[in-house]
């Protein structure tokens, strides 16, 4: 696990900006938030900051994984969850050498990983045979999990509605503004009236700044548009069992139930979640080149979403200047990876409990 902001990104930025099929695409807008985010991102592209961010993300991810294991063991939930490991594949020797150095650093933080050569990669994941000649090596993390996030959210909703203290969900209600009173919130104004509560948790992704800025609170969150394809697996041996990340192309492949989920791209191109057909075609080409026998492309389901990214890659969680307003935003592409940890931390803080892990680097200043 490593942040996007790192020294290795700097030399890649010029070619990324010039190529239409680059994994990171930038379309400048007359948007102060976009340019400020870009400057803060570039400032974070140094080794010291990258190492610190890596340590913090691993700390949070390990905690989230332990909470996930507790949940799966204690509750009967079905979301195609499986612990199948992950391979991060590198196609350039220099990139692989850098990944090995990062692996050694992450090992010092108790991350279980090992480096594999191309032959070992294909032995572990035979579906990678079509990529073998392009591979320099891969980093294997056996403890990685996958699951269907949509099913997971529905299962959590079911559990919360059926528990001893049932939760009421109010879908379709639009939050218009937060109502501060001195050092607290007195309510939330919505399209159906004012809602009042003891505590308020703001977990709105890229929409968080719109509600916080009138209160004088700035969170460095800006949308990075990402894409995914969901494809039926038509050849079991042709589709990967282990999750695979193509490091150069920034594309992730994961078997989820009977489907292959393919996700990638990062478009810094404004705040509109509109699917770009060209980006979908590029993802299709990546799948066809890497796992040509895996699926039937005529049945693909494309999707795009706005990742709430911070320049450093760390979420913003915890307290604000209003005593009963809490933040849980800025997870970027790691929402599912970090969600249980950040949710538990905010719940602990609101209840007056001490969180299980240190929060340096996550608190809003």
Model-derived features with residue positions:
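General small-molecule cofactor/ligand-binding pocket signal
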Residues: 114-116, 168-170, 300
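Short, conserved active-site loop motifs that form the nucleotide-linked donor/cofactor pocket
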Residues: 166-168, 260, 325
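Helical element adjacent to the flavin cofactor pocket in flavoenzyme catalytic cores
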Residues: 97-109, 129-199
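Surface-exposed helix-capping loop/turn segments at secondary-structure junctions
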Residues: 70-82, 162-168, 217, 291-298, ...
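Active-site substrate-recognition segment that forms the wall
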Residues: 1-45, 129, 175-186, 194-323
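C-terminal lid/capping helical subdomain adjacent to the catalytic/cofactor pocket in oxidative enzymes
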Residues: 115, 128, 178-182, 233, ...
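Short beta-strand to alpha-helix junction loop
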Residues: 52-65, 88-98, 138-158, 274-282, ...
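Dinucleotide-binding Rossmann-like beta1-alpha1 core, especially the glycine-rich loop
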Residues: 1-118
């Amino acid at each position: 696990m490593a942040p996007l902001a790192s020294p290795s990104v700097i030399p890649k930025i010029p070619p990324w900006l010039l190529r239409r099929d680059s994994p990171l695409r930038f379309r400048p807008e007359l948007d102060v938030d976009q340019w400020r985010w870009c400057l803060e991102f570039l400032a974070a592209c140094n080794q010291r900051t990258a190492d610190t961010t890596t340590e913090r993300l691993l700390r949070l991810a390990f905690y989230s994984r332990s909470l996930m294991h507790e949940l799966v063991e204690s509750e009967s939930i079905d979301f195609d969850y499986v612990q199948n490991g992950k391979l991060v594949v590198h196609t350039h020797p220099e990139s692989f050498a850098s990944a090995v150095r990062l692996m050694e650093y992450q090992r010092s933080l108790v991350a279980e990983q090992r480096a594999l050569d191309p032959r070992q990669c294909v032995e572990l994941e035979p579906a990678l045979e079509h990529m073998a000649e392009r591979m320099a090596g891969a980093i294997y993390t056996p403890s990685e999990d996958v699951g269907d996030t949509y099913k997971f959210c529905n299962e959590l909703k079911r559990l919360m509605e059926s528990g001893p203290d049932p939760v009421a969900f109010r879908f379709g209600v639009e939050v218009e503004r937060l109502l501060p009173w001195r050092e607290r919130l007195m309510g939330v104004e919505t399209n159906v009236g004012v809602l009042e509560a003891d505590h308020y948790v703001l977990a709105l992704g890229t929409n968080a700044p719109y509600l916080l800025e009138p209160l004088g609170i700035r969170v460095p969150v800006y949308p990075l548009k990402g894409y995914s394809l969901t494809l039926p697996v038509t050849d079991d041996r042709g589709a990967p069992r282990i999750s695979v990340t193509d490091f150069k192309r920034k594309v992730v492949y994961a078997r989820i139930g009977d489907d292959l989920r393919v996700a990638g791209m990062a478009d810094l191109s404004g705040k509109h979640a509109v699917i770009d057909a060209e980006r979908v075609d590029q993802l299709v080409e990546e799948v066809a080149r890497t796992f040509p026998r895996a699926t039937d492309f005529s049945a693909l389901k494309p999707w795009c979403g706005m990742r709430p990214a911070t320049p450093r890659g760390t979420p913003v969680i915890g307290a604000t200047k209003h005593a009963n307003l809490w933040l849980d935003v800025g997870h970027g592409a790691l929402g599912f990876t970090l969600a249980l940890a950040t949710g538990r931390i905010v719940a602990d803080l609101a209840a007056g409990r001490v969180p299980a892990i240190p929060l340096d680097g996550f608190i809003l200043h």
